[in-house]
Regions:
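Catalytic machinery of carbohydrate-active enzymes
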Residues: 1-210
């Protein structure tokens, strides 16, 4: 499979859903793309547009706590994936060292990594101002000067050319996929068991941070 851009997001589930606007913008700009996430979030493919086939990496290979022990195994896994998936650019939205190693291993050159990568000497590399904002937000949510979804989008903006501003302003851009009939019926069955006094509206926040 040949891609213009592979988006790597090894963050939490809520952050993963916030990749949708970036995927939408890349698609509208004519870029072939998909998403690489943690294996435990494989079912997310049904919620995201322009992320099929969704690629997943075993969770333990990219755990920061096991980075030293799994480094060589992760490198071998990346080389195996690259044999079947070639991307001209990697957009890495995760600043951890395993994510940087993975992004660099999948990219044709270190300079082809947007966001968080490694330089030719293996030192951490941040490509631009927006990833720097994103890194600050990852360290402490209260440091985030902008909406997380927009920081994701602007990290990938170099691949959008002059379209980035236009795409960001489009109404309805970056919406998640609509739920299928089976998922809707499951939700209705769950809500049907609610006590009478609970009937009405239900609010959900997927991926709450603090």
């Amino acid at each position: 499979m040949r891609l213009d851009a592979l988006v790597i997001n090894l963050n939490r589930f809520g952050d993963l859903l916030l990749s949708q606007p970036l995927l939408h913008d890349l698609h509208k700009a004519g870029r072939s793309t998909t998403l690489l996430c943690l294996e435990k979030y494989a079912d997310t493919e049904g919620l995201l547009q322009f992320a099929s086939p969704l690629l997943t990496v075993p969770d333990h290979l990219v755990s920061p706590e096991q980075a030293d022990a799994t480094r060589h195994e992760l490198q071998a896994w990346a080389e195996n994936l690259r044999a079947s998936v070639q991307a001209d650019h990697i957009i890495n939205l995760t600043p951890s060292m395993p994510a940087r190693l993975l992004a660099t291993a999948l990219a044709p050159t270190p300079e082809a990594v947007l966001g968080f990568g490694l330089d030719h000497k293996g030192r951490p590399r941040v490509d631009g101002l927006w990833p720097a904002f994103l890194h600050a937000a990852e360290l402490r949510q209260s440091n985030a000067p902008f909406n997380l979804a927009d920081m994701f989008r602007m990290t990938g903006a170099p691949l959008l050319g002059g379209l980035s501003g236009e795409l960001l302003s489009q109404p309805g851009s970056g919406l998640l996929s609509e739920l299928g009939t089976e998922a809707r019926e499951t939700a209705r069955r769950l809500l049907a068991h609610a006590p009478v006094i609970r009937h009405g509206f239900i609010g959900m926040q997927l991926g709450a941070r603090e």
